[in-house]
């Protein structure tokens, strides 16, 4: 761990940041990569990498000093200055030779060649000790040709080296490939130089022996120069690779450093932080589906204010300090990115990338632009949804019209049989037609004769045994069979969808909206097939009409279609539209099903499930709001269009206003602001230490159980009064004009003032809790509540089962068997036995007479009937005694009874004239006189029935058995009614 990180962990929060500009060029002034690795182990060099202020190290004099190498201020062509010291190898050779001007000219030419070929400028070669002048001589052709060869070799090597560097930057393998390529370039340069000198200098040496020593010296100088240039090139490539490697190490260290800074700061603050304050119940996050500003934006947009310790838990940490830390981190990371990525630098050769502007993380001081973008995106998404719905509806309408057209085209014609009229109707029609024809001219005089002739033939044909009727029935059956066979066998020109077999095979193919595919394809073929079926049916109908014998009367008659039998009917297809399936809260998929359905490797994290669950809940909540308010659409309406009264209703329903202080101390923070101030509400929630997204994850399970337990408790009247005043405070604060931030600030101020005296509130809370809580061991239940609920134990009732009992068999009495019962067949016994039946019959007769006279509205008859009933009851006992006394002389009984009746009638006429006498008893079989009297009475009734009144309807004649005279009529203004008992009723019934 770096010393800066150790200091950060020991001191607490101390954000150590790196400077915005790095002096990484100092690390390149080293001899080899080995020295880099050795010096990386030390602390000074590492601090130089990180940009900490340290004294600059002394540079090696034997190495080339590279100024501004690979720095952002460098140009596209690297400018390198070679500063040679007095101990260099080139100066040793200059001491031994006296040709200074020749070497200067050669060096100047070599400098120009190298500048044009490899873009490397050799500025000065300064000898320290030897300053003698040399003789100027022109360069020979061999040296110029050698310089050209050196230029070609350098150009090829430089291009190869550039390609190799690109490969190394892509594959990140520096040491293996570059070592081999460096050796390859060294050997190639040496071989090319030797070949040039052998070819060009060899023949000139023999011709000019005086200048051999000068040529050899020039060759050695050129070889040394070429060796130095190649070595410098190798060192340049190594420096470039080392720079890239150091930049990558620096980027890794910076990322690790800032990650550890943030991690250790959070670890330091978490023990001192309080648990994120959460209210008892908050409206669901999906009720107000607002956009959330990122924490970085909140950090940049926040002002330099001290955060309260009770709200967020950060101790003495200002927003400005964190802002400085964030700015330094972003600046350093962007600088490292520019060093590593070629697209992010200004030295890119691509024209398109030069025009690309790098987007910076600009602080958003006001969220108006962000909010405008979010609103624009919401409106655009709703517009696309509406267009998709309209296009889908148009497609469905077109599909339904196609199906309707297909159904109309494939609908067959219902063919009814002709009605067969009955024979009598046929005859009448034929007669009417004959009469109409007879009225015509004499030219058509033969038409009735022809119409009369088919009558016997038609009757013969309509008979069940006629051969024509049998042939007609056979023809009907054969026509039906051929129709069935034709319907089963599909014709060749029909489409596959119209045949029953293909429809079965294609039944499983359905469209997205539940309509069968066969119903929406091949409409032309179906219309042609339907026309073919219609033609076939019409041809069959014509054939049947030709074979069928018709009478001219059948065409004239018009009958109803419901009375005619069905001849043929084309069975139509059944189309079913499957209903659309909507998700309900019961049918929502579970978390396991959602995670198992997704197959991407990133679905293991709970963020995807949380986002999906939040979106599904928001969709269901929007549907509920649309049910409550008809002006709100679940899709087209924006979240800001949710009515405000719904917010308050859900708040009052869900928030426990009767809870304790710990539950209600953050009511102001949990309230969701109206839609126009959404950004400030989310910022306040982030400042208070929680966000709507991470809220369900932070809340622990015991705290939820504790809150649920507190909700179920009952508080006393004092607690209710305190909460009522608290609620009035809350209502007053809500009614004040101002933004949501002011409201939350007031509520937070109230919360802080309440938390200043926790001891008194804790004691009062404990007292209220002890008063309101129940002790399960000391609960007294009155007996009046327990008595009806007490269970009574039923007594055991023994069920009696049948048993066998012993029966003592006793012999039957013999004297009872010996005695024989003798039936008494005397008349007295029979009369006594039948007396009760006679009384019943008399009562029935009297009731019948009463109802008969009542229908005729006769009041006198009702009185007579009442008197008659009374007389019958009075003399019933006398009649019984008279029957017993006169059993031997049955013919004397009617006379005595008649005399009694006469006496009674006289007495009744004196007292009550409207009462009738009792009936006269009859002895059966009747005598001839009695039957003659009855017949005479009937004849008189028939004669006087039309003119007599209601009192003269029935007149009964009674005679005594001794005299054969007819009975006398009373002429005192009222007729004498006499009853003849059972005999009269029997005679009337017989008639």
UniProtKB/Swiss-Prot annotation:
Record keyword Zinc-finger present: no
Modified residues annotated as Phosphoserine in this record: 463
Every PEHE domain range: 798-919
Positions with biased composition (Polar residues): 749-763
Segments crossing the lipid bilayer: none
Paired cysteines (S-S): none
Signal sequence coordinates: none
Entry keywords, A to Z: Acetylation, Isopeptide bond, Phosphoprotein, Ubl conjugation
InterPro entries: NSL1, PEHE_dom
Highest taxon of source: Eukaryota
Post-translational modifications reported in the UniProt record: Acetylated on lysine residues by KAT8 upon ionizing radiation-induced DNA damage; deacetylated by HDAC3.
Crosslink position(s): Glycyl lysine isopeptide (Lys-Gly) (interchain with G-Cter in SUMO2): 136
Location of the region described as Disordered in the Swiss-Prot/TrEMBL record: 443-462, 749-770
Biased composition (Basic and acidic residues): 450-461
Protein name per the record: KAT8 regulatory NSL complex subunit 1-like protein
Name of encoding gene: Kansl1l
